[in-house]
C-alpha cells in the first residue's frame, strides 16, 4: 500500500482515536473518522506488545495490510481508520484474518458493498 494510504503520525492517530467512533469483534478494533472530500481512504495499523515479539507483530501487520489490499476497491474513500489487532488475532491464518477483518469492516460500514469472502 502506498504511503499516501497510511496514517503514520501520532497526532493523526490521536485525532482518529478522539472521535470515539469504534467497532470491534473478538480479534480486531476499528476506529474511524469521516473525511469528506478525501481522494482515498487512509489507514493506520497497530499491533500491541502483547502479541509476540517484533517479528511476529510485523507478520500480523503484513496479513492485515494484505487483507486491506484485497478489499481496497470496496473500501470507502471518505474515511481515515485505524485497525488495532487484539491479542486474540495472534496466530490466525490468512483466511481467518481476512474473514475477521472483513466482518469488522462491514460492521463499521467501511465497505461499499457487503462482502463475505
Swiss-Prot record:
Q: What EC number(s) are associated with this protein in UniProt?
A: 3.1.26.5
- Pfam families, from UniProt? Ribonuclease_P
Keyword Hydrolase appears in the UniProt entry: yes
Name a biological process GO annotation.
tRNA 5'-leader removal
Instruction: Please provide the record's keywords in A-Z order.
Output: Endonuclease, Hydrolase, Nuclease, RNA-binding, tRNA processing
Q: Which reaction does it catalyse?
A: Endonucleolytic cleavage of RNA, removing 5'-extranucleotides from tRNA precursor
Principal EC category:
hydrolase
Q: Name one GO molecular function term.
A: tRNA binding
Keyword Cell inner membrane belongs to the record: no
Q: Name one GO cellular component term.
A: ribonuclease P complex
Q: Where are the transmembrane segments?
A: none
Q: Which family does it belong to?
A: Belongs to the RnpA family.
Q: Quote the subunit structure annotation.
A: Consists of a catalytic RNA component (M1 or rnpB) and a protein subunit.
Function summary = RNaseP catalyzes the removal of the 5'-leader sequence from pre-tRNA to produce the mature 5'-terminus. It can also cleave other RNA substrates such as 4.5S RNA. The protein component plays an auxiliary but essential role in vivo by binding to the 5'-leader sequence and broadening the substrate specificity of the ribozyme.
Q: What is this protein called?
A: Ribonuclease P protein component
Originating species: Limosilactobacillus reuteri (strain DSM 20016) (Lactobacillus reuteri)
- Gene, per the UniProt record: rnpA
Amino acid at each position: 500500500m502506498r504511503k499516501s494510504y497510511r496514517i503514520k503520525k501520532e497526532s493523526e492517530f490521536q485525532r482518529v482515536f478522539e472521535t470515539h467512533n469504534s467497532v470491534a469483534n473478538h480479534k480486531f478494533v476499528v476506529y474511524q473518522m469521516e473525511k469528506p472530500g478525501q481522494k482515498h481512504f487512509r489507514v493506520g495499523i497497530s499491533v500491541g506488545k502483547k502479541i509476540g515479539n517484533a517479528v511476529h507483530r510485523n507478520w500480523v501487520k503484513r496479513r492485515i495490510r494484505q487483507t486491506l489490499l484485497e478489499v481496497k476497491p470496496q473500501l470507502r474513500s471518505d474515511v481515515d481508520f485505524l485497525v488495532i489487532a487484539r491479542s486474540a488475532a495472534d496466530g490466525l491464518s490468512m483466511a481467518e484474518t481476512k474473514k475477521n477483518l472483513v466482518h469488522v469492516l462491514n460492521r463499521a460500514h467501511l465497505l461499499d458493498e457487503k462482502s463475505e469472502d
